[in-house]
């Protein structure tokens, strides 16, 4: 059989890996085997937390809305507010409502007056 010369393929792969892991601490940025393990862990965490970020922001918006609703006495509860929004077919999502609640309370009052039964 003929000999296969691989050239610098392995070095290229390790260099690419080293660039990815250059910000890691200790042996995780120096040793190839631990670099590969940490890279896998980092990518798994990034993938998992992209989904978690969406849930966290939704929770934040709901918490902000609930706080403003209780503080101002616009409604008795958050879920009655959302329920009435859907009944009146107002297409405002939680993100927009939270922004309105923080920055423009008078607009929130007009929305609540619009949807009150």
From Swiss-Prot:
The keyword Transport does not apply. GO terms for molecular function: rRNA binding; structural constituent of ribosome. The keyword rRNA-binding applies. Gene3D superfamilies: 6.10.160.10, Ribosomal protein L20 (1.10.1900.20). It comes from the Eukaryota. It is found in: Plastid, Chloroplast. InterPro entries: Ribosomal_bL20, RIBOSOMAL_L20_CS, Ribosomal_protein_bL20_C. Belongs to the bacterial ribosomal protein bL20 family. This is Large ribosomal subunit protein bL20c. The gene is rpl20.
